[in-house]
């Protein structure tokens, strides 16, 4: 996957409600009409006023349907899964039907202009259809003051554990913004807790963000404005998340971040140390895939990384963006490495990890790129014949240094993108593998629904027949055909389908991270189509699990206090009346 999405605006941080207003969940319980009326009133006049008053627009949050759309990288997708899980755990129904939804949660990507254009168009469409809207992701985090975001609720990339509160207030008609950073004693944290409820898009694949932000300051990157500087999760929290995932039937874990290679530098550890700890808890038959890493940081750990990538439960795959094969262009990008560094990493890993798949990214038409610069990039692709290559035409992102540089003409950028794409499609990376027998892990269905999609040890895509017995299993296949991006494999007739030593996966759309009792109750509730109020859900849920709302138990205690206070008032009132 390309690293497609990856700042703080202190004066835009707003609390969900003001101090004078009651907390969102309190409003379900503190109702003005339960306060005793001591003074007599003219009943006829009162009824007439009631008849002439405008109709009530009262809305009880926690029973609406929500449609979630996510653009961008695997980190963004993980955030979207977490938000879906929390909303479902609270009682909202997550729907795949946008027109049927009461609220749209749009989780954006700021890497390229087209992604933001799609995001903006979706906002416009939601407004035309009178949908409630909550915005998330890197676009509103990086530029919350854009005109087309005015009046809309925003949840920041580090505040996704409060999505229920933001949605709740938005449904009530309020516009709220939460853009703060998670900190502990002044130290920036990786983000929301990893043990929050989640709905995995694919129940077999767990995406774990090991850190957020990065250590670089690339001149073209808008993601830095949203995700900020490096902040890593502790190793024990990541290992616990992996263990929980395997207990829920996951058979493949993706480690993601804006730069996995920089992991741990802010907390006194490093990527190899984390990977060795994770390898210890991966069940046989399950696999680990490492996400994008920039050349400067992996250079320090080449020996250890080679050993890890040779491990049978780790895909021999690494995504290392080069962006350009011209040192002068890399300098203008502030990439903090030269082409020789990139080649050293790739050459070393190819030697020490036979068959490894190296994926890379290239930007065509960066400001100042000459024809000679571009030809150097073409030569690099011709030399290494990358089986996975993400070619991106340069788009100047607002507020970045590169946007202020002298731009390459649009037509030149387009032509260079086409030329490099032609080079990429001139070779066939998998033809020589026809006839091989491979072990593949089956994890999903193809887009055309004709095959199941599996991956071999090198994370190369292998299409296999749609046999339900294969899903989530290790299957032995003979490769009989290849294309530009895939191979096709025929299962060996006498080979045993290997079942990983893990639990049965959750059903599609099922919430992870919940206790068994709570999950069963939630499933019964959603399947019957009946929804209790947010208040009753809080009462039932709090006895079984800790929901991802920091005020939950405080609210329950507050409700009890309010109830007792009201009883006291009623008692005092009747004592006074009858005395």
From Swiss-Prot:
Residues 64-172 form the MTTase N-terminal domain. Expressed in pancreatic islets. SUPFAM superfamilies: Radical SAM enzymes. Binds 2 [4Fe-4S] clusters. One cluster is coordinated with 3 cysteines and an exchangeable S-adenosyl-L-methionine. The chain crosses the membrane at residues 556-578. It is linked to Type 2 diabetes mellitus: A multifactorial disorder of glucose homeostasis caused by a lack of sensitivity to insulin. Affected individuals usually have an obese body habitus and manifestations of a metabolic syndrome characterized by diabetes, insulin resistance, hypertension and hypertriglyceridemia. The disease results in long-term complications that affect the eyes, kidneys, nerves, and blood vessels. This is Threonylcarbamoyladenosine tRNA methylthiotransferase. The gene is CDKAL1.
């Amino acid at each position: 996957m390309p690293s497609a999405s990856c700042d703080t605006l202190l004066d835009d941080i707003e609390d969900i409600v003001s101090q004078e207003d009651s907390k969102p969940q309190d409003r379900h319980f503190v109702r003005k009409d339960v306060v005793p009326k001591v003074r007599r009133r003219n009943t006829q006049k009162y009824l007439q006023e009631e008849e002439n008053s405008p109709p009530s627009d009262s809305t009880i949050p926690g029973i609406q349907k929500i449609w979630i759309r996510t653009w961008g990288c695997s980190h963004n997708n993980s955030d979207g899964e977490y938000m879906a899980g929390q909303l479902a755990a609270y009682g909202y129904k997550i729907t795949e039907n946008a027109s049927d939804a009461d609220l749209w949660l749009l989780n954006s990507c700021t890497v390229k202009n087209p992604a933001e254009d799609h995001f903006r168009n979706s906002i416009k469409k939601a407004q035309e259809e009178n949908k409630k809207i909550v915005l998330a992701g890197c676009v509103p985090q990086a530029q919350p003051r854009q005109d087309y975001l005015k009046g809309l609720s925003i949840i920041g990339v580090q505040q996704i554990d409060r999505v229920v509160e933001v949605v709740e207030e938005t449904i009530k008609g309020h516009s709220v913004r939460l853009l703060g950073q998670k900190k502990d004693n002044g130290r920036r944290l990786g983000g929301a807790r990893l043990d929050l409820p989640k709905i995995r898009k694919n129940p077999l694949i767990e995406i774990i963000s090991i850190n957020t932000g990065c250590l670089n300051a690339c001149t073209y990157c808008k993601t830095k404005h949203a995700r900020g500087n490096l902040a890593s999760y502790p190793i024990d929290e990541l290992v616990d998340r992996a263990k929980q995932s395997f207990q829920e039937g996951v058979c493949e874990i993706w480690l993601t971040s804006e730069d996995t290679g920089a992991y741990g530098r802010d907390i006194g550890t490093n990527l190899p140390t984390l990977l060795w700890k994770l390898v210890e808890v991966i069940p046989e038959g399950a696999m680990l895939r490492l996400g994008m890493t920039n050349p400067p940081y992996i250079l320090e750990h080449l020996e250890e990384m080679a050993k890890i990538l040779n491990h049978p439960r780790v895909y021999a795959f690494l995504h290392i963006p080069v962006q350009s094969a011209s040192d002068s262009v890399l300098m203008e990008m502030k990439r903090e490495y030269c082409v020789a560094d990139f080649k050293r990493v790739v050459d070393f890993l190819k030697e020490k990890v036979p068959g490894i798949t190296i994926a890379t990214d290239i930007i065509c038409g960066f400001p100042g790129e000459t024809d000679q610069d571009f030809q150097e990039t073409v030569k690099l692709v011709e030399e290494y014949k990358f089986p996975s290559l993400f070619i991106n035409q340069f788009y100047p992102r607002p507020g970045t240094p590169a946007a202020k540089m002298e731009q390459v003409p649009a037509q030149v950028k387009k032509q260079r993108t086409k030329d490099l794409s032609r080079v990429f499609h001139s070779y066939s990376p998998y033809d020589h593998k026809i006839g091989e027998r491979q072990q593949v892990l089956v994890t999903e269905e193809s887009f055309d629904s004709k095959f199941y999609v599996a991956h071999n040890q090198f994370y190369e895509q292998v299409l296999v027949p749609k046999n339900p017995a294969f899903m989530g299993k290790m299957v032995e296949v003979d490769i009989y055909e290849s294309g530009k991006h895939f191979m096709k494999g025929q299962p060996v007739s006498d080979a045993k389908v290997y079942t990983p030593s893990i639990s049965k996966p959750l059903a599609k759309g099922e919430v992870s991270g919940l206790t068994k009792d709570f999950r069963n109750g939630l499933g019964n509730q959603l399947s019957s189509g009946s929804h209790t109020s947010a208040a009753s859900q809080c009462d039932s849920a709090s006895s079984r699990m800790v929901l991802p709302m920091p005020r939950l138990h405080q609210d329950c205690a507050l409700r009890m206090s309010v109830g007792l206070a009201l009883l006291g008032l009623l008692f005092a009132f009747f004592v006074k009346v009858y005395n």
